[in-house]
Amino acid sequence: MARGINKVILVGNLGNDPDTKYTQAGMAITRVSLATTSMRKDRDGNNQERTEWHRVVFFGKLGEIAGEYLRKGSQVYVEGELRYDKYTGQDGVEKYSTDIVANEMQMLGGRGEGGGGGMGGDRPQRSAPRQQGGGGGQGGGGYGGGGGGGGQDYAPRRQQPAQQQSAPPMDDFADDDIPF
């Protein structure tokens, strides 16, 4: 029987500083609010902006990294999965929550925007990601891990070396042979 897919990809800005707490076993749990903004046209052709707020949770090593390096306003790429929880509040009423449990994170923006490399400590360095299209300076800092179970300690993801591709072979024909 086929399994389902539960995958969320977000690029947005933090609406608050991360809130990091530790379990009794020492595992980090970091929570942030992430804002994503989309544009669409209304019936009259005017652009309408809509901002959605997402609750994102990071576990383990990924939680430690998020808590240490992310700040309010930081732009971040997050991959994870939706999780719906039901709990009883302090007032005795059943409550529901929807969170994104992150398993991968990429800090975006320059150093002044909360992302980027060059910070000291035990943080593994990573070269800047490949850029598609124009310029812009996206900083490094891609990390994976953080599933949220069993108190596992997740290691930072290491960038795989880019595969070298040779140029395609040149065909043996002259420009005059092209029919247009």
From Swiss-Prot:
Positions of region (Disordered): 107-180
MF terms (GO), sorted A to Z: single-stranded DNA binding
Annotated Low complexity bias: 157-169
Keywords, comma-separated and alphabetical: DNA damage, DNA recombination, DNA repair, DNA replication, DNA-binding
Matching CDD domains: SSB_OBF
Short motif Important for interaction with partner proteins, span: 175-180
Top-level taxon of origin: Bacteria
Gene Ontology terms describing biological process: DNA recombination; DNA repair; DNA replication
Physiological role: Plays an important role in DNA replication, recombination and repair. Binds to ssDNA and to an array of partner proteins to recruit them to their sites of action during DNA metabolism.
NCBIfam families registered for this protein in UniProt: PRK08763.1 (NF006445), ssb (TIGR00621)
Name of the featured protein: Single-stranded DNA-binding protein
Taxonomic source organism: Xanthomonas axonopodis pv. citri (strain 306)
